[in-house]
Swiss-Prot record:
GO terms for biological process: cAMP biosynthetic process; intracellular signal transduction. Residues 46-845 are extracellular. CDD domains: Nucleotidyl_cyc_III. Belongs to the adenylyl cyclase class-3 family. SUPFAM superfamilies: Nucleotide cyclase. Disulfide bonds: none annotated. It comes from Trypanosoma brucei brucei. This is Receptor-type adenylate cyclase GRESAG 4.3. The chain crosses the membrane at residues 25-45, 846-866. One of its GO terms (cellular component) is membrane.
Length: 1229
């Protein structure tokens, strides 16, 4: 039987007329006609001929509303008609449609395939529509190697890899994840329910998936409604329904996810939901129903329950945008093509208005759905290569297909492939190209509108929405107090910065930080936040609040800023990132002490004035100062009459009107200085800028802050660089916008490590990590130890909820111009105070104290003399950096080619190395640095001051150059080593081997020591055995790696060390920039600087192939000699020592030998073999013994040649090994 084709010209009737449902009798007649007569295919054919593709439309279902079916098909037609039903040159499409929507799709397809006989090579299928039809048709599609384009189903049973269904929408389970995500991110509801009909659409499976998903987010469903879906579409019994409903409503759900189509029980559920007082305000969130518009369903529900419309209560997911979202380029084109189609074919039933898709949102959404299907079909048919067989076409659809429709992307689609291919980025076993879920809500007048923040995307490389990639959200609040102009503006500035760090809502994004504003006023803010926390999920409150709000229970505050001054009291749920008032006062008073200022005055506003005055006085006394006068202002008072013409005045608690008064006073009285708190600068920044811009008084207004300069376009701060990239508008660069950005960056980065997010877990993050570093901002340590007994703190320094570090003193002039210098370099205040004793002693008490003191002094003298003899080896730790939050500058030194020099000059090296140690230790003392350890001839030195460290390294090179070594042998050996290297390396040019002797003597002399310097935070530990401090972590590793790539006589500084120097310090140094250098174990290149300690020296290229023996991240490393002692021939003495150790330790296990040999390695300066593990084996022990023997043997040979009576010692740090002259005789016995 051959099909008859009805050709359609440009002026013919539309390609499909409105089709309505037929009666059952007519349906049987149609089936008979389909088998006895040819099918009429309505098509637009290119008169020039070409390939014709038949598209069988199964985009209909007997169970679906006709308006839904017509809308989808109208959208499909609009796409194809826009190109005159031609998908490519010479490729036309014929759409084959059923005479009636009452014909069973499966039977329609079977009959049509029989009509075509065996000619199926140019055949595609559109649809099917509906879960039951998709299941019935799949076997037929598979048997005939056909693919159903754009099937519309919502069942979880179709979520596996089914290559004969080409889905353009996300899976139903994925759509159900999105409402759950929305509940936590935007709605922030505490009680979330779930509704499904058992046996319908895989409802129980969808519920199980949803339970698993929200448990990952730290939530659970408060209540579940489910009844069995009865056969024949009949609802369950009223008694069963009522019982289930009462249990569900008793949970007081604030939102319910509804996973069901409009069966009687589902409709009854909605009516109960809107009419029951317990649930009448509940949000309804649902995947798209498909069979009927959610708008129609909701309208019918409210009318039946006689309940008015409450907008924004119903939220629905969809797979495509609404037809009116014309900010999307694809939708703009859709509107043009849809309007043209409906204009040309006005007789199309129900859509005689060309703008129908803009007036009926539900129909418009379905038209977009059909239009996208047409666009995908058109792109899939563009290539001619697949047209030889149906199998070839099927395979072509899964060759990593991605369809780009303007700015809408569908795909990737991929077929069978192995795990290796998948790991390399291929999409495998994926027949679902929908990667976007669009959420919309029913607004006023039953119109659908896009939900703000309701667009969730997955990567095209991810086939299904995996719940594991959806991160638990942190839902934060900011507060806009509209009745206070300055606070509202401050909140807006803070939100400008923090909003750049919040989540985009894309699925799989590691950042899940969401922020919402609460609009209120200063009087209602406490009550509204208290009510909100009882009804909604609130993880934390950020930014500007009132002091009263901080006392609300159950809320967590991250870096709160209050308009009135207050002291910090420890509260676990209040985390400060900015300097507290106590920290600011400490830093400012420290500055006053450094400039030897007179006693300051204090003018203060606020309810905590007495306590703040006490805190200021305590701080001043600590630094040897005191208050000259104090004034507490009452409401309405001004500061002008209380400002002295000279001297220092603290003004704590500013009013807006004070700023102009202060500017005028400082401009006129040049000897006056005013100090204010940073929160006043931040909140009133606009007023300060307006008043002090171009004013001479700007240099005399001071404050303390831990922020880098927010408007420095030439900044070296990583934080500010990121801030400027995020906030492009220069006028929005303010202290509060930068503060918001830094706060958001901290949350953004740390959320990646949180598997669950709650207020308590967020607080735990700070106290568990103790010290937190984000970009170049450092916070901590945060401490909360168990030191409170019966409400009394029993230990000092055991609790800290503040963590600002690197607090510097600025003038207002610097705030206005970033090139103005800091008044005081950054410091991390210890908040250790001197507490004077206010109780005077009676004369008798005083006499007793004096007498007792004399006795104590005499006793102390005796004990001191005794200690000089018994504790001479005790270390002096005064100069050791001990502040865990303060940066430490580490210096590593090493003698170049030391092992080769020992082999060449065993007689000279002991004295040379002793001189080396003595000279370096004298410099350590001179520059108040700290000797951490020596390993062999390498030093590890710590310094509190970066400049002192650089000065030490510079003078080290100069002292070695000027020292009289009493021999030229060392220099001759270095030149010989260079020539030997040049013979082996063609590209190597000896820097000193062929230098003129006179020039050489001005630049080089004796031992060549390489030096590496790096500055950063360390893990500082006190060793009870050595009674000294050691420094661990990335900073020590970086310093060691810097030294390891240097050449002898060269001093290298990292970028961090160089930038830690002040501008004045850097001006005193001669430094050459070496550019970015790749260091082993460091993920990114490090910018290096060379300190030209001896001008004129030239060096070989950096030793970038250098490999450290110790490559661990958390251990201190020191560089080692250039050559292993394994390569040195053992002398007679060394062989004797090796034999002695092997005989002595031969019966020990390897672990016991390791324990015994390790102290010798440390004290003799013997480096361990490369890549040796933590646990030694027999070979490792033998190698270590050989190295010890080689090192000690050199010394024994030298001293044995001089005298038979002397013992020898290694040159390690203060340790001695005695070797008897009779040792060899003892062994021979």
């Amino acid at each position: 039987m051959i099909a008859r084709v009805c050709r359609l010209t440009k002026h013919s009737k539309p390609p499909h007329l409105p089709i309505t449902l037929t009666t059952p009798t007519l349906f049987l007649v149609v089936l008979v006609l389909l088998q006895l007569h040819p099918i009429c295919v309505l098509v637009n054919v290119d008169d020039g001929g070409g390939v014709t593709v038949k598209a069988i439309s199964l985009l209909y279902s007997r169970k679906w509303n006709v308006k839904v079916i017509n809308a989808v098909n109208a959208g499909l037609n609009a796409s194809l008609a826009a190109r005159n039903w031609t998908v490519a040159p010479g490729v036309n499409v014929e759409v084959v449609r059923p005479p009636s929507y009452d014909i069973d799709p499966a039977q329609f397809l079977d009959v049509y395939l029989k009509v075509l006989n065996d000619d199926k090579s140019l055949l595609v299928v559109l649809g099917p529509m509906g879960n039951d039809d998709a299941e019935k048709l799949y076997d037929t599609l598979e048997e005939n190697r056909l693919v159903g384009f754009g099937p519309m189903t919502v069942s979880t049973r179709h979520e596996g890899y089914m290559p004969h269904l080409y889905f353009l929408r996300p899976e139903a389970t994925g759509e159900s994840y999105c409402p759950s995500t929305l509940c936590g991110e935007s709605l922030r509801v505490l009680r979330q329910g779930f509704m499904y009909l058992d046996g319908l659409l895989g409802g129980s499976e969808a519920y199980d998936h949803a339970v698993d998903f929200i448990s990952r987010m730290g939530y659970s469903f408060c209540c579940v409604f489910t009844v069995e879906d009865k056969a024949g579409g009949q609802g369950g019994s009223s008694e069963e329904f009522d019982a289930v409903w009462d249990e569900f409503a008793g949970g007081n759900p604030q939102a319910v996810i509804m996973f069901a189509t409009m069966k009687p029980d589902a409709k009854k559920f909605l009516v109960r939901l809107v009419s029951d007082p317990r649930t009448e305000d509940t949000f309804v969130l649902t995947p798209i129903f498909l069979q009927k518009s959610i708008v129609s369903i909701w309208k019918e529900t409210l009318e039946e329950a006689n309940v008015p419309l409450h907008p924004h209560r119903v939220i629905q997911t969809g797979s495509n945008p609404l037809a009116k979202e014309d900010y999307i380029d694809a939708i703009k084109r859709f509107q043009t093509e849809m309007r043209n189609y409906l204009t040309e074919y006005k007789e199309w039933s129900g859509f005689n208005d060309a703008d129908h898709f803009l007036k009926n949102d539900a129909d418009g959404e379905l038209m977009v759905n059909g239009w996208i299907a047409g666009e995908v079909l058109r792109r899939a048919l563009r290539s001619h290569g697949w047209m030889n067989t149906a199998t070839a076409f099927l395979e072509s659809l899964y060759e990593q297909r991605r369809y780009v429709i303007d700015d809408i992307v569908v795909g990737d689609f991929g077929g069978e492939c192995d795990s290796f291919t998948s790991a390399n980025g291929a999409t495998c076993r994926c027949n679902r190209g929908g990667k976007n879920v669009y959420m919309r809500e029913i607004a006023e007048d039953y119109r659908l509108q896009p939900l703000v923040g309701g667009h969730i995307m997955t990567t095209p490389l991810q086939c299904h929405i995996d719940p594991s990639i959806l991160r638990p959200p942190l839902t934060g609040l900011t507060v806009d107090m509209e009745d206070h102009e300055e606070l509202l503006r401050g909140s807006t500035q803070f939100e400008t910065g923090v909003s750049t760090t919040t989540s985009s809502g894309k699925a799989g994004e590691m950042n899940s930080f969401f922020l919402q504003k609460v609009v209120t006023d200063t009087q209602k803010v406490s009550n509204e936040l208290n009510t909100l926390r009882q009804e909604r999920i609130v993880t934390a409150v950020f930014g500007i609040v009132t002091k009263a709000v901080l006392g609300l229970p159950g809320l967590t505050f991250i870096d709160p800023i209050t308009p009135t001054p207050h002291l910090n009291s420890f509260s676990r749920n209040v985390i400060h990132l900015s300097p507290t008032l106590e920290q600011q006062l400490y830093v400012l008073v420290n500055y006053l002490s450094s400039i030897r200022a007179d006693f300051p005055n204090c003018v203060i506003r606020g309810g905590e004035a007495p306590a703040i005055i006490d805190a200021l006085r305590k701080t001043l006394v600590t630094f040897g100062l005191n208050l000259s006068s104090t004034v507490v202002l009452t409401p309405g008072d001004t500061v002008g009459e209380h400002l002295p013409k000279s001297g220092i005045t603290f003004i704590i608690g500013l009013a807006v009107d004070d700023i102009v008064v202060i500017e005028e006073h400082l401009r006129i009285h040049t000897k006056a200085r005013v100090l204010v708190q940073f929160s006043d600068i931040a909140l009133l920044y606009n007023e300060f800028v307006q008043a002090f811009n171009n004013s001479d008084g700007a240099k005399h207004l001071l404050f303390a802050t831990s922020l880098p300069h927010w408007a420095d376009v030439d900044t070296t701060s990583e934080t500010v660089r990121r801030f400027h990239e995020a906030v492009r508008e220069v006028e929005k660069w303010t202290p509060l916008s930068l503060l918001g950005f830094t706060t958001g960056r901290l949350i953004q980065e740390n959320l990646q490590n949180m598997e669950r997010v709650t207020s308590d877990l967020l607080v735990d993050l700070f106290f568990n990590q103790t010290v937190i570093t984000i970009d170049d901002m450092h916070y901590g340590p945060y401490k909360h130890y168990d030191c409170i007994i019966n409400g009394v703190v029993t230990a000092d320094d055991c609790m800290a909820n503040f963590g600002a570090t690197d607090i510097s003193v600025w003038s207002m002039a610097r705030a206005l111009r970033s090139d103005e210098p800091l008044l005081q370099n950054p410091m991390s205040p210890s908040l250790v105070y001197t507490v004077p004793n206010g109780n005077a002693l009676t004369p008798a008490q005083l006499a007793g104290v004096v007498g007792g003191s004399l006795f104590v002094v005499a006793l102390a003298i005796c004990l001191s003399v005794l200690a000089c003899f018994t504790l001479r080896g005790t270390r002096d730790n005064d100069s050791a950096p001990k502040e865990p939050t303060g940066p430490v500058t580490l210096i590593f030194t090493d003698i170049e080619s030391s092992t080769a020099l020992w082999a060449a000059h065993p007689d000279l090296m002991p004295d040379a190395v002793a001189t080396h140690h003595r000279l370096i230790r004298s410099l350590i003392t001179r520059y108040e640095c700290y000797e951490v350890k020596t390993v062999g001839d390498s030093f590890m030195i710590a310094s509190k001051s970066p400049f002192a460290a650089v000065q030490l390294a510079q003078e080290l090179q100069l002292r070695f150059l000027r020292l009289d070594w009493e021999t030229n042998a060392l220099d001759e050996s270095y030149r010989e080593f260079e020539e030997q290297r040049a013979e082996g390396e063609c590209e190597y040019t000896p820097p000193t081997a062929h230098m003129d002797p006179e020039v050489y003597s001005r630049l080089w002399n004796g031992l060549r020591v390489r030096v590496g310097i790096h500055t950063g935070l360390c893990d500082i530990r006190y060793d009870e055995v050595t009674k000294g401090y050691d420094y661990y972590g990335r900073t020590s590793n970086m310093a060691a790696r810097t030294e390891s790539v240097a050449n002898g006589g060269q001093v290298l500084m990292t970028h961090a060390a160089y930038m830690s120097l002040s501008g004045e310090d850097r001006n005193q140094l001669d430094v050459t920039t070496l550019g970015a250098t790749v260091l082993r174990g460091v993920p990114e290149p490090v910018r290096m600087y060379q300190l030209n300690a001896v001008p004129g020296r030239n060096f070989a290229a950096l030793r970038l192939d250098r490999e450290l023996f110790n490559d661990g991240e958390d251990e201190t490393t020191t560089s080692c000699s250039d050559h292993s002692s394994l390569r040195a021939e053992l002398s007679i003495a060394a062989q004797t020592i090796a034999a002695s150790l092997q005989s002595l330790l031969g019966t020990f296990t390897p672990a016991q030998r390791q324990k015994a040999l390790t102290p010798f390695c440390e004290r003799c300066g013997v480096t361990l073999p490369r890549k040796m593990g933590h646990v030694w084996d027999n070979d490792s022990c033998q190698e270590v013994i050989r190295r010890i023997a080689a090192k000690v043997g050199h010394v024994v040979d030298r001293h044995a040649a001089e005298t038979r009576e002397r013992s020898v010692c290694t040159l390690s740090s203060g340790s001695v090994i005695i070797i008897s002259n009779d040792l060899s005789d003892m062994i021979r016995v």
